[in-house]
Amino acid sequence: MSRKKKPIDIFLQPGEYFVADAGYQIRTMLGSCVSITLWHPATRQGAMSHFLLPTRGASKPKQTLDARYGDEALKLMLIELQRLGIPSAQCQGKIFGGGNMFPGNLRSGALNVGQRNGEAALTLLREHGIPVMSESLFGIGHRQIVFDVSNGDVWSHQVMPIGTDSGDKGDLL
């Protein structure tokens, strides 16, 4: 009788990304930050990012790519996948996070950081021709994310702040 080998567990900190094969699962915790997962079904390889802001803007010259920024994190993942012979158009994308961590402090009409991050992720995948298979974006509170690279599944558990009537919400996406 053969036993399924337990995957190697990787935890992403903000500003990190990881590219892996089916022997890994990648986890993180998101507030206003966003994670993009990319999965290639034929090779069972994937990537996940944890970015803080959509872009670094024009204030600093781009010396090297920095995964703290959504546009650069996606470029880094696509470069690594391309090195493995995986075209971006054959990947399946999923997006998570963009929560509003301070709902009482939002000015009327202003986009919060989480909203900007989530919208940037959707735009980035669309611009690269990567289909978005599912998403769990926005809302209040933080999310715990687990990406099983062996099958492309992502578990998302949203935790609402104390004092909200929504409670916890967990989904397999």
Curated annotation (Swiss-Prot):
What's the source species for this entry? Albidiferax ferrireducens (strain ATCC BAA-621 / DSM 15236 / T118)
Keyword match Lipoprotein: no
Any keyword Hydrolase? yes
- EC assignment: 3.5.1.44
Q: Which UniProt key words apply to this protein?
A: Chemotaxis, Hydrolase
Which InterPro entries does this chain map to?
Answer: CheD-like_sf (IPR038592), Chemorcpt_Glu_NH3ase_CheD (IPR005659), Cytotoxic_necrot_fac-like_cat (IPR011324)
Q: What would you give as a GO molecular function for this chain, any one?
A: protein-glutamine glutaminase activity
Q: Which family does the similarity line name?
A: Belongs to the CheD family.
Biological process terms in GO annotation: chemotaxis
Known function? Probably deamidates glutamine residues to glutamate on methyl-accepting chemotaxis receptors (MCPs), playing an important role in chemotaxis.
Q: Which reaction does it catalyse?
A: L-glutaminyl-[protein] + H2O = L-glutamyl-[protein] + NH4(+)
Name-wise, this protein is Probable chemoreceptor glutamine deamidase CheD 2
Species lineage, top-down?
Bacteria, Pseudomonadati, Pseudomonadota, Betaproteobacteria, Burkholderiales
